[in-house]
């Protein structure tokens, strides 16, 4: 009987060893599996976030940062509809409030940078734009739609200046506005300071005092139901930390 028991125990041990080998042979394998961190961010953040994403990947082996850049209102809508996201960075507090009101934030949002509007015109300024009042003249003006942060800021400066614009189109992201200016489809567009900076010689920027009436504050948070909450928080920490501020400042963003 003892021999039978020893034989059964030995057989069980062999079976367990074989099962472990068949499953990869190591408890470390799941941790080494590739992970995708999904970051939803306002279109105006594309360049600095891509740089920070590369840095994050270099510090986290087997992690890929996948970005979705669009208008903040569009991104909130996608998250509300179930799109998988680990981190959300908005170009204003209004759209972040939509996320928190729906209970879709994992942690309290943190304000991490600011941005203001600037007039963008094609190189050479063919329409002769000089200030905000010039945008009410006979020209093709393109702005952001009111539900987008840059559109809400446009309405604020319009009201502050006592003007009424008649844009030929209202776009869903500040990038779309800039593209219409650089392509020559528009004589002028209201975009962020950072967008004028990144466009280089393709556009000229015109500052106006009313821009200070609409300083956009950018908050960031991890998203409730995230598949990677710890990694998401580490990315938020990178953005809100010293290195994040340094990178953002390099693209023309202001302090929070």
Each language-model region and where it sits:
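Secretory targeting and sorting signals
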Residues: 1-25
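Extracytoplasmic metal-acquisition and chelation regions
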Residues: 23-26, 80-84, 114
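Soluble periplasmic/extracytoplasmic beta-strand elements of cell-envelope proteins
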Residues: 38-40, 66-68, 87-89, 98, ...
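Signal peptide-proximal N-terminal region
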Residues: 54-66
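Pocket-flanking alpha-helical
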Residues: 73-104, 128
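Short, glycine-/small- and polar/acidic-enriched structural segments
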Residues: 109-118
């Amino acid at each position: 009987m003892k021999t039978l028991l020893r034989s059964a125990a030995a057989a069980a041990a062999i079976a367990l060893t074989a099962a472990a080998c068949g499953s990869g042979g190591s408890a470390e394998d799941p941790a080494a599996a590739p992970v995708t961190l999904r970051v939803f961010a306002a279109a105006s953040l594309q360049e600095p976030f891509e740089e920070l994403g590369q840095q994050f990947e270099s510090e986290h082996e087997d992690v890929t940062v996948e970005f979705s850049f669009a208008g903040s209102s569009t991104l909130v809508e996608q998250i509300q509809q179930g799109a998988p996201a680990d981190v959300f960075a908005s170009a204003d507090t209004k759209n972040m409030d939509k996320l928190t009101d729906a209970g879709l934030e994992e942690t309290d949002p943190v304000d991490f940078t600011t941005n203001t509007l600037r007039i963008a015109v094609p190189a050479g300024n063919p329409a002769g734009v000089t200030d905000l009042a010039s945008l009410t003249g006979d020209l093709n003006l393109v702005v952001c739609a009111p539900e987008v942060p840059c559109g809400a800021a446009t309405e604020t400066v319009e009201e502050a200046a006592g003007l009424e614009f008649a844009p030929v189109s209202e776009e869903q992201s500040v990038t779309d506005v800039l593209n219409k200016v650089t392509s020559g489809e528009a004589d002028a567009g209201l975009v962020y300071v950072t967008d004028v900076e990144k466009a280089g010689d393709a556009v000229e920027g015109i500052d106006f005092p009313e821009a200070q009436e609409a300083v956009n504050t950018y908050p960031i948070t991890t998203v409730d139901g995230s598949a990677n909450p710890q990694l998401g928080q580490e990315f938020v920490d990178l953005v809100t930390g010293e290195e994040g501020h340094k990178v953002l400042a390099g693209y023309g963003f202001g302090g929070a």
